[in-house]
A protein has these predicted regions:
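Short, glycine-/aromatic-enriched active-site segment of Class I SAM-dependent methyltransferases
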Residues: 141-157
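Short alpha-helix
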Residues: 159-174
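A short SAM/SAH-binding and catalytic strip from SAM-dependent methyltransferases
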Residues: 104-117
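Conserved beta-strand signature within the Rossmann-like core of class I S-adenosyl-L-methionine
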Residues: 132-139
Length: 194
């Protein structure tokens, strides 16, 4: 079973098995400086669990969620069908072109699952990020905690998350601009820009 099949088969109960830490999410999104009317892309949106938090920061801005799981996208569409400025698209961010330019791009709890982390991040920045936009990679846990979870749940989760300084340096070596990189025992985030 690959990860997309895993997501599709678990989508119906996904929201009930995942706990969102409001304090961590709010802290990370505050650091990201979402502005009123920002156009936002939520990569790996799943069932749209992050959308209410993003929408709270930016109730008038357009939000687009993309995910490669058709079942996850269908659930997200149903959950937000009455909210006019939120749309969803079935897409694999690594292989599909995402239409549009965005002020903010968010990869929340999805980055370790990318097979081509650097090239995908670079593609999103070059093709989809506005000139003064920012891209956020974030996790509501530390590298150690996440990698421990991944290790106990292989083979569904096989990638690992690099130490924040290693990842920052890899981005810099690839010519990407890292504005901020932070990790403690509770959160992990990197903010990049053009």
């Amino acid at each position: 079973m690959d990860y997309t099949q895993f997501l599709d088969s678990n989508s119906i109960n996904w929201d009930y098995t995942k706990i969102m830490d409001i304090c961590k999410i709010s802290y990370i999104l505050d650091r990201f400086s979402i502005k009123e009317n920002d156009k936002i892309l939520d990569v790996g949106t799943g069932t749209g669990m992050l959308i209410p938090f993003v929408h709270q920061h930016n109730p008038k801005g357009n939000i687009k969620g993309v995910d490669k799981s058709i079942n996850m996208i269908e659930i997200a569409k149903e959950k937000f069908k009455n909210v006019q400025n939120i749309v969803f698209q079935l897409a694999d961010v690594e292989s599909d072109d995402i239409k549009g330019t965005f002020d903010k791009i968010i990869l929340f709890s999805v980055f370790p699952l990318l097979k081509h982390k650097i090239s995908t991040t670079k593609k999103l920045i070059e093709n989809n990020l506005s000139d003064d936009g920012k891209l956020l990679i974030a996790h509501p846990e530390s590298t150690k905690s996440l990698n421990s979870y991944i290790g106990t749940n292989a083979p569904i989760y096989t990638p690992i998350l690099l130490d924040i300084y290693q990842q920052r340096n890899m981005f810099r070596q690839a010519g990407l601009y890292v504005e901020e990189a932070f990790e403690n025992d509770r959160i992990y985030y990197i903010i990049l820009h053009k």
